[in-house]
Structure formats: structure tokens, C-alpha cells
């Protein structure tokens, strides 16, 4: 695997993981847990 492919996969995985995390953090800040 090339470094470019690994970099793209890591960026995609971070975006996919950051999606739900941002929603959870926003809900926690609003106290809607």
C-alpha cells in the first residue's frame, strides 16, 4: 500500500468517526443526554 492510500484511508476513517463524536459532544453540551 502506498502512503497516499494510507493517508486517504486515515482521513476517511477520521471523518467517519468524528461524525457521531461531534453529535455526541453537542448533545452532551446541551444536556440532552
Curated annotation (Swiss-Prot):
A cellular component term, taken from the record's GO annotations: chloroplast thylakoid membrane
Predominant subcellular localization, coarse grouping: plastid
Keyword Plastid in record: yes
Domain of life (superkingdom): Eukaryota
Keyword list, A-Z: Chloroplast, Membrane, Photosynthesis, Photosystem II, Plastid, Thylakoid, Transmembrane, Transmembrane helix
Topological type in the membrane: Single-pass membrane protein
Plastid as UniProt keyword: yes
Coiled-coil portions: none
A GO BP annotation: photosynthesis
Transmembrane residue ranges: 5-25
Subcellular localization, as worded in the UniProt entry: Plastid, Chloroplast thylakoid membrane
Cited function: A core subunit of photosystem II (PSII), probably helps stabilize the reaction center.
Family, as annotated: Belongs to the Psb30/Ycf12 family.
HAMAP family named in the record: PSII_Psb30_Ycf12
Record note on quaternary structure: PSII is composed of 1 copy each of membrane proteins PsbA, PsbB, PsbC, PsbD, PsbE, PsbF, PsbH, PsbI, PsbJ, PsbK, PsbL, PsbM, PsbT, PsbX, PsbY, PsbZ, Psb30/Ycf12, peripheral proteins of the oxygen-evolving complex and a large number of cofactors. It forms dimeric complexes.
Protein name: Photosystem II reaction center protein Psb30
Species of provenance: Chlorokybus atmophyticus (Soil alga)
Taxonomic placement: Eukaryota, Viridiplantae, Streptophyta, Chlorokybophyceae, Chlorokybales
